[in-house]
């Protein structure tokens, strides 16, 4: 015996409402980084006024030159140098 069309519609709408409410609960619990947290994090880990040398910032990703022709991994269309 099948369900009537009106019961299927009501159950479908109830499911949509439930999923919409469940989605807003998850979205509301997401935490964001605030400006004070960003300001506090802009120093060295062991930064101390008594030891100012520990407060120097270091470059995150120092520049490294890519692979050259002599290493054999450079895209060169001509013959390899000997």
From Swiss-Prot:
Could you give a GO molecular-function term held by this entry? Answer: hormone activity
Presence of keyword Signal: yes
Keywords attached to this Swiss-Prot or TrEMBL record, sorted alphabetically, are:
Disulfide bond, Hormone, Secreted, Signal
Compartments it resides in? Secreted
Q: Where is the signal peptide?
A: 1-28
Read off the InterPro entries from this record.
Answer: RALF
Query: Induced by what?
Result: Slightly induced by abscisic acid (ABA) and accumulates during senescence.
GO aspect biological process, one term:
cell-cell signaling
Task: Please give the GO cellular component terms listed in this UniProt entry.
Answer: apoplast
Q: Which cysteines are joined by disulfide bonds?
A: 47-55, 67-73
Expression sites by tissue: Expressed in leaves and flowers.
> What is known about what this protein does?
Cell signaling peptide that may regulate plant stress, growth, and development. Mediates a rapid alkalinization of extracellular space by mediating a transient increase in the cytoplasmic Ca(2+) concentration leading to a calcium-dependent signaling events through a cell surface receptor and a concomitant activation of some intracellular mitogen-activated protein kinases.
Which protein family is it in? Answer: Belongs to the plant rapid alkalinization factor (RALF) family.
**UniProt xrefs under PANTHER family:** PROTEIN RALF-LIKE 15-RELATED
Identify this protein by name: Protein RALF-like 8
- Organism source for this protein? Arabidopsis thaliana (Mouse-ear cress)
């Amino acid at each position: 015996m099948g369900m009537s069309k009106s019961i299927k519609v009501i159950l479908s709408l109830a499911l949509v409402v439930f999923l919409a409410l469940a989605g807003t609960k998850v979205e509301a619990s997401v935490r964001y980084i605030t400006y004070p947290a960003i300001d506090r994090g802009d120093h060295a880990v062991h930064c101390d006024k008594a030891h100012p040398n520990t407060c120097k910032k270091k470059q995150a990703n120092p520049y490294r030159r890519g692979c050259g022709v002599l290493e054999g991994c450079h895209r060169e269309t001509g013959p390899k140098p000997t």
